[in-house]
């Protein structure tokens, strides 16, 4: 299972202490000569292409930046502390402990200062007093990772979602005849006309009377996709299956169905004795490769039109 939600503690560095010392200009004139302290380090959340979930945070949940250096005599400023960078995957939502969104890190190389370092204390240069530095900031935050897919495949067990996913992405995710082969969301890029879009395969949806809270928890990753693809491999029961899937999503969070484009895919069309006349259906056969390119084109055109 992917790790997609953790709580972390961040603390930026306090400013460096200002220096208090005397500077003798002549035998009769003495002034303050202490320099300002350096700025404390920020704690910065940074989107990294090398992270695909939050598993790294299992072993470390506290991130503390260094304090700025003390000011020096002869009005020399203390060295500023380096910023502390915390790498997160693209698609991470940062929330406070009340679950309010602070920032959505959904762009490559995006950065966000979650705790700002304190400014350095004033030295006593040309005056007879110094001022204390500012302390660093402390914050607990929730990192809520939502897979940045644009298309998601949904279905009950043994509908052929993973086979379609493999065909579109040229991946080799596990496929078997027994149910619940896919245990965790899978995502990869699909190419069309030299452009890429991200598609996601999901575990089979369980009906509420037989599902634990954890099993359908992957539905939280429907937050980002613009297209929901409902998949069935049974020509006799596909309408009922699609209704069940929508009902389970609505039960989990009805907002996940809002502002989405829905596709309805009927797999295993090579086994049908009679072809359904439902115009909403996209008929494909993964076994024979039939309809895959049509589906790829429809997905791309819909995404391209929505931008």
What are these regions (language model features)?
Residues 123, 160-161, 271-275, 285-307:
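Conserved GTPase G-domain signal focused on the G5
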Residues 13-14, 51, 93, 119-120, ...:
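Conserved nucleotide-binding/hydrolysis micro-motifs of P-loop NTPases
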Residues 144, 148, 167-182, 194-217, ...:
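Switch II (G3) loop of P-loop NTPases
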Residues 1-157, 190-192, 200, 298-304:
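Conserved P-loop NTPase architecture
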Residues 187:
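Anionic-ligand binding region
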